[in-house]
Curated annotation (Swiss-Prot):
One of its GO terms (cellular component) is mitochondrion. Residues 232-244 have a biased composition (Low complexity). Residues 219-231 have a biased composition (Pro residues). Keywords: Mitochondrion, Phosphoprotein. This is Mitochondrial fission regulator 2. InterPro entries: Mtfr1. Residues 250-282 have a biased composition (Basic and acidic residues). Belongs to the MTFR1 family. It is found in: Mitochondrion. May play a role in mitochondrial aerobic respiration essentially in the testis. Can also promote mitochondrial fission. Expressed predominantly in testis (at protein level). Expressed to a lower extent in spleen. It comes from Mus musculus (Mouse). Residues 191-286, 298-322 are annotated as: Disordered. The lineage of its organism: Eukaryota, Metazoa, Chordata, Craniata, Vertebrata. It holds the Pfam family Mito_fiss_reg.
Length: 361
């Protein structure tokens, strides 16, 4: 009997699960600073706001920064003929979908982003080229045009101007080099146009001599002199009488065409010589090929006392060896294609180390 009494007393002293949970809740509330006596008031009175639930009470006690709440104000379509006085109307929950994309919600703004100055509170007139967001017409989202101009960057304009100046300077340099090359060719061939003597120096040459500081790092080396063409007589044929006017121009044209033909022939011969020299360069030199012959080492081969190489005994593989099975199957399949015995790796060899044969078909 005393044992039963002690067991019953111990059972009564054990805490129930509900009391354990209540103790945990009270400790949590005391940790967050919530009075324990307020629990009964929460259960009896149905308060509103932050005292409606335990979660709200705990959240009110915690030092958390509240999130920013967006306030939506939908601006109606205002034409230029209408007045600036208007009333903002509150949108429905269907307009909240446009918040995901800021570009589509161009007509929405937060309350903290409103202009503070009174003169800036006026709404710009509605232009047909600038479309606003409309939930009923999703096709306008893709066809929206932007009329806002980008700010002008002065640094970019300066860079563009500098690049243009450098480009003009390079063009003048190229023109001067071409003119010098033409004069050199005409002097070498002995053909000088009389009309070129009275021409003043071109602007390209003057720009090259006056403005050398624009791009000092872009100075090009002088071109190599062209190969001298074969000499030919500049005198007109004696049978033709010299006439002022048409006869003189005819002789000049004939000389020019003859010069072009000879220059083309010289270019062809130069190209042929160049191609021949290139072919000779591509052919390998035998001295370079044979200079490393002494460094070649042969593989040592076992020889018999008579001097003949010792032939290795062929290993007889078992019937269940996978290498022998595969080799026998391949031999039976390709035996009819090549039955010659003079090949190094013939199909009749039973060595598993022989190289595979390639089919002719």
């Amino acid at each position: 009997m005393p044992r039963d009494g002690t067991n019953e007393q111990r059972f009564l002293e054990l805490p129930s699960p509900m009391s354990f949970i209540l103790n945990i809740l009270r400790n949590v509330l005391e940790y967050f600073g919530v009075p324990v006596d307020q629990d009964l008031l929460i259960c009896q009175n149905k308060n509103c706001g932050s005292a409606r639930s335990i979660v709200r009470i705990i959240g009110r006690r915690l030092p958390l920064k509240p999130c920013r709440r967006p306030h939506f104000e939908l601006i109606p379509h205002v034409n230029s003929t209408e007045s600036d006085d208007y009333e903002l109307r509150v949108p429905s929950f269907a307009d909240v979908l446009c918040v995901a994309n800021d570009e589509e919600a161009s007509c929405l703004r937060f309350r903290h982003s409103l202009w503070q100055k009174k003169e800036e509170r006026k709404i710009a007139p509605f232009y047909p080229s600038k479309l606003t967001w409309d939930p009923s017409s999703p096709g306008l989202r893709q066809n929206k045009t932007e009329t806002d101009d980008l700010p002008v960057n002065e640094a970019a304009i300066k860079k563009i101007a500098a690049l243009e100046d450098e480009l003009t300077f390079l063009r003048s340099q190229i023109a001067a080099i071409v003119a010098m090359q033409d004069l050199r060719e005409s002097r070498e061939t002995g053909f000088i146009d009389l009309s070129d003597e009275q021409v003043p120096p071109s602007s390209a040459t003057t720009g090259l001599s006056v403005e050398p500081d624009h791009a000092p790092s872009v100075v090009l080396p002088p071109p190599p002199p062209p190969p001298p063409p074969p000499q030919f007589s500049l005198q007109p044929p004696s049978s033709l009488p010299m006439q002022p006017g048409s006869a003189n121009t005819h002789d000049i044209d004939s000389l020019a065409t003859e010069m072009e033909r000879q220059l083309s022939g010289v270019k062809k011969t130069d190209d042929s010589h160049h191609s021949k020299s290139q072919r000779l360069r591509d052919v390998p030199n035998m001295l370079d090929v044979l200079k490393d012959v002494n460094k070649v080492r042969l593989r040592p081969v076992e020889r018999s006392p008579g001097g003949r190489p010792v032939q290795k005994r062929k290993r007889r593989s078992s019937e269940w060896d996978p290498v022998s099975l595969i080799s026998n199957a391949l031999k039976q399949k390709f035996a009819f294609q090549d039955d010659s015995f003079d090949r190094e790796n013939s199909s009749w060899e039973c060595s598993p180390f022989s190289s595979p044969e390639t089919s002719r078909f």
